[in-house]
Amino acid sequence: MSDSRLLPTGSSPLEVAAAKACAEIEKTPVSIRELWNPDTCPANLLPWLAWAFSVDRWDEKWPEATKRAVIRDAYFIHCHKGTIGAIRRVVEPLGYLINVTEWWENSDPPGTFRLDIGVLESGITEAMYQEMERLIADAKPASRHLIGLNITRDIPGYLFAGGVAYDGDVITVYPG
């Protein structure tokens, strides 16, 4: 360390000790490219990467794949806030399907829209519903107003339907 140090010759012992301690950092292999990539960042650093990408909602209980998807979509959401695409990117990483119906597609007042959110087998909690409303309000266009938020669930199974048509005349035959 004495040959390669960048400190001046009159440095204090504290400065020399600090330089030696900081020199150990150079031996740590850290690829900045991997740290700033949501797909390759170590799982224990994902909360800090989410903070750096300004993720609007974060939950430690999410599976790792959901956390990575939310971080990956954060840039798109911030670039496209105020669009239907941003609303989709906010809701879909949480595992819900979304269908948007805008005012010109039906007879609703101008400047309004409705959302149909399809939940999976897990359902939806009251806290998640409130959080979803907050996220949608943050991502929706400022000139649009949400007038309907429907939560739906598809139930797979078989449905048998049948029909019968009966047509005929009543004929009465009298003797004679």
Curated annotation (Swiss-Prot):
Cellular component (GO) terms are: virus tail, baseplate
Broad class of the protein's primary localization = virion
Q: Would the keyword Ion transport turn up in this protein's UniProt record?
A: no
- Induction profile: Expressed in the late phase of the viral replicative cycle.
Q: Which GO biological process entries does UniProt record here?
A: viral tail assembly
Q: Name one Pfam family in it.
A: Tail_P2_I
Q: Where is the signal peptide?
A: none
Per UniProt, the keywords (alphabetical) are: Late protein, Viral baseplate protein, Viral release from host cell, Viral tail assembly, Viral tail protein, Virion
Localization (cell)? Virion
Query: Per its UniProt record, what InterPro entries does this chain match?
Result: Tail_protein_I
What's the stated role of this polypeptide?
Baseplate protein that may be part of the wedges of the baseplate. Plays a role in tail assembly.
The name on file for this protein is Baseplate protein I
Name the species this protein comes from.
Answer: Escherichia phage P2
Phylogenetic lineage: Viruses, Duplodnaviria, Heunggongvirae, Uroviricota, Caudoviricetes
